[in-house]
Amino acid sequence: GRLACCIRLLNNKIPTLEELKMPPVLTELAQKRRGLILVTGPTGSGKSTTLAAIIDYINKNRACHVITIEDPVEYKYTQEKATIHQREVGRDVDSFSNALRSALREDPDVILVGEMRDYETISLAMTAAETGHLVFGTLHTSSAAQTMDRIIDACPPHAQEQVCLLYT
């Protein structure tokens, strides 16, 4: 093989939801106290930037505890009203699921899961949302139907029916 490099340049400034021309419903979702909110789309579609804008909105408007779990950390937050702890998979933690399990012991109000790739992470994120946390996550899907299919397909057969009942 040959040596190759891929570099993604990101702006140091986190754009606001208004600057991203996001609909007002995202501001409303950022004000929720619990639930599971998924941002979906293909690689490079703006999922991380959208979530950064949402977390930054929360940071500027709400005194709360936010934990982000990312691979890699793409934006650094300056703490304002919120206390924000950022974890990077591979550096601070070994996996999304272990980081999420650990985060739940730290009494967060808001949790950002950079990618929900496997059943354990998805299950923990759903449990966190059901137990009173506001959870944001991403999936590489292009429609609501594909997102539900991806979540259900990640679950073992014994859990698929329960997930269908909870989220449809």
Residue spans of the language-model regions?
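Short, flexible helix-loop junctions that flank or precede catalytic/ligand sites
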Residues: 1-166
